[in-house]
């Protein structure tokens, strides 16, 4: 299933429709809150998102994240221009920080998979 905004290239959307279900939602950007409502009405009550920092930030900002999994591996990836978990404006004030409660920690090879519940979605 793929979600695109109304400004998406019509030719590309037509090609996508031949291979997947395409939901057109939002004018310039996909309206994430509306999209989640649409998915819910279609019977989708739980989703897994493997998106980039912009999508993850948008979901947090809209209060649409109720749990998150993070993986801590045995290599360091970083630097000024390295991607982060969330992009966008960021969480500047203490009151806007997403608060997490650790649900589970599981060792996988040389890393740890952490399952968090979001306290204040």
Where are these regions (language model features)?
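Enzymes that bind and transform nitrogen-containing heteroaromatic metabolites
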Residues: 1-121
């Amino acid at each position: 299933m793929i979600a695109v905004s109304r400004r998406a290239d019509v030719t590309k959307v037509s090609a996508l429709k031949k291979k997947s279900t395409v939901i057109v939602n939002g004018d310039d950007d996909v309206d994430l809150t509306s999209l989640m409502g649409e998915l819910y009405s279609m019977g989708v009550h739980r989703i897994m998102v493997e998106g980039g920092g912009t999508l993850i930030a948008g979901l947090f900002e809209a209060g649409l994240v109720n749990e998150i999994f993070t993986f801590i591996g045995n290599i360091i990836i970083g630097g000024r221009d390295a991607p982060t978990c969330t992009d966008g404006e960021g969480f500047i004030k203490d009151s806007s920080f997403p608060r997490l409660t650790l649900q589970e920690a599981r060792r996988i090879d040389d890393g740890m998979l952490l399952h968090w519940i979001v306290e204040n979605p």
